[in-house]
């Protein structure tokens, strides 16, 4: 489909004034707004997609539909908030001294001064309201994803169309004392990845560590197109077809200069630019509350995961976004000869 329209620009609509959180470096805010679904960007994207699926297409097509929610700000009409009364919510897991066993560079790197902290949310009583706003946003977008899928299922393309649902990043909703995406921990890098395809196994759930880099090779493979040797990812078609469990796969996340996390089926290993480390066992510690990096019993695990680290990290350049998230990033830019842009 050689036209653009499946992603409306911006993160709005926005009220005239923020409801709770006021910062010029983040969209973070929450509350009931606007009054109607029709005023939401995602509603317009969904309607565009439905229109495209109702058209006749005489050749294969690719249709991308970009939904904003549950990206901040967590605004949605009242009916979506009503589905999640604050007094009935279960709060995300939070440990007050969670970061006591991580290296100093981890605390410096992960500091996000423009975002709310969980301590602040607890003290002000806003945490249930934040979670309500987040869940309202999820319910809203879930409904309109469903509207697009219903349009597909009612179209002539229902039986020969591959559907992939994914998110570009995760989010901390109070875990690790933050409401942010900026981290090398699980909540930031774990994203939805759902594939519905002809020949796939219905209802199958895989615990394999996969990456968004795998999406393009997967779609090439499923569409019967030639593989591209330049792609770093690997096709997930064997996993979707139930032919492979995906054992031995790894996914990497990077944040800042030369800081990387490796996620396998069981462990997450983080190594920072100064050599400091974190290691978490997701079988026994899904909340990543116990850093095992200094435990000699896990030396072999660290060594195995470290083999997945890149041989080198790309240098920062003047075209790098210079907005400093925190003091650590500002210093990192200066060491690279780049004057950081710092917003107040």
Where in the sequence are the language-model features?
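Formylglycine-dependent
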Residues: 1-78, 115-124
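Polar, surface-exposed loop/tail segments
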Residues: 31-34, 38-50, 61, 73, ...
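Short catalytic/ligand-binding loop motif for oxyanion handling, primarily in non-cytosolic enzymes
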Residues: 60-61, 69-76, 172-175, 179-182, ...
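Histidine-centered active-site microenvironments of extracellular/periplasmic hydrolases
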Residues: 73-76, 150-204, 211
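A short beta-strand-to-alpha-helix junction
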Residues: 100-101, 128-139, 183-191, 200-217, ...
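Long, internal low-complexity/basic segments
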Residues: 111-129, 137, 292-344
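C-terminal, low-complexity/hydrophilic appendages and adjacent surface loops
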Residues: 186-187, 251-294, 329-344
